[in-house]
Amino acid sequence: MSDIQSSKYYTKTDPVSIVPLGEYDVARAKEALVELLAPIGGLGFVKSGDVIIIKANLVSAMKPDEAATTHPVLLSALTELLIEAGAAEVVIGDSPGGLYNSAHLNKVYNATGMHDCEAHGAVLNTDFTESEAKFPEAKI
């Protein structure tokens, strides 16, 4: 495990990766993601059987070419890489602006092209259950 993965806070000396993609193609996106993640040890943190949730920045029901949300090609490529690394399930989800219910979330999934990710092994979150969590050490 690299120092970044085990550190609690990031510093100005932590590596930053930028890799040009050129065009939205899943195979090219996979290559770019491998290169992008290499400085922090790649996907070596993924253990066989892991369930991984990707927060996809689905802020609004906008088309992928409007560049307001994470592009479905990048999420499809990342999903494939995570499954190849051993993940049992890759879930894509978010709490987009607006109501957090099935109708609104499906509108966002449709507009942003998230359903395309399902063909690459991703599961779109449709779980709206709530639970209470207590943090007695928290300060207000």
Regions found by a protein language model. Give the residues of each.
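N-terminal and secondary-structure boundary signal
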Residues: 1-140
